[in-house]
């Protein structure tokens, strides 16, 4: 058929879940050579007949974003050009805007945003607290080696509590009085024998988990008044805290740890595996083998999928629920060097961000494996950590001694819905 060469026409149905942008459900004849640009012109012409303003859309054809000509996309999917093709369109997620550059004295290896605050960890052994408007609030010494990870335990108008981990083999629990801007180290957590590279706080904020270069996964109490008995009394009095549980199973460094729920942990490792741990059973529930060292891994509570960052420039998508969990659901191409860090959006089901040794952050839709939605530029050296915990801000730290803050501008459609 001529359409296969991009010269003929294809019958399509245009569908959307965003009802305020719906067009009549009738077949439309369009050129097989169309791309997203031409489809946007065609669709907006239909919508303008309804009095709508011009809108940028992305187009899903058989569950994947169209990133070239329609005829090439159909051929790649082995879809018959004789059939009527259903194309789903969605309002394009707007490009995040660069907002701030927070200058530090050394590499920024850890970032975590919550509310109006940004917590950062540096290679000069310090932790820093900033506002999301770029004002520096506090520099916190205490560790004796570079910081590797940070996470908030709790945060309200009066107090903030957080945990930091370091190459000095410890985790530290901190209490910050926001009014007086004073911070105290509540406990030093000792038990790892190498650098503590990852940390995650439980959903109820009563515990936290750490992953280390010593291959061990450890669980700790995060409570201020942690009851200790017998021989551990002296440790309590000195402010030293010991692990509640140690889980062995990885063969190399644990680079990522995350709570999937209150009793389940996800870890990623340089040993090429993802492991899902059942804390009630104190053992491994699921293991996913990959073909590369995992530098970071993140689980989405919205879509239940895991995305990984690896040494071969690619990001990969896995489904831990299937018997074929080790089968890669998708591979995302776009970075030009090691991908160091990755995180799902906490509010947008299909979106995630990544940071790489190519000095770039990228914003992805998991349905678009061939190209990211946007490049988030600004870093002058490799990106070491990225965070999208606060839906309004994408925050990244790098070897250029800066934190870059990008404001996420979600598309506003409320005015359309009320018309």
UniProtKB/Swiss-Prot annotation:
GO terms for cellular component: nucleoplasm; PeBoW complex; preribosome, large subunit precursor. Residues 10-91 are annotated as: Ubiquitin-like (UBL) domain. GO terms for biological process: maturation of 5.8S rRNA from tricistronic rRNA transcript (SSU-rRNA, 5.8S rRNA, LSU-rRNA); maturation of LSU-rRNA from tricistronic rRNA transcript (SSU-rRNA, 5.8S rRNA, LSU-rRNA). SMART domains: WD40. The lineage of its organism: Eukaryota, Metazoa, Ecdysozoa, Arthropoda, Hexapoda. Required for maturation of ribosomal RNAs and formation of the large ribosomal subunit. Pfam families: NLE, WD40. The keyword Transmembrane helix does not apply. Transmembrane segments: none annotated. WD repeats lie at residues 103-141, 142-184, 191-230, 249-287, 289-328, 334-374, 378-416. It comes from the Eukaryota. Keywords: Nucleus, Repeat, Ribosome biogenesis, rRNA processing, WD repeat. The keyword Lipid metabolism does not apply. Gene3D superfamilies: YVTN repeat-like/Quinoprotein amine dehydrogenase. It comes from Drosophila grimshawi. Belongs to the WD repeat WDR12/YTM1 family. PANTHER family: RIBOSOME BIOGENESIS PROTEIN WDR12, WD40 REPEAT PROTEIN 12, 37. This is Ribosome biogenesis protein WDR12 homolog. GO terms for molecular function: ribonucleoprotein complex binding. It is found in: Nucleus, Nucleolus; Nucleus, Nucleoplasm.
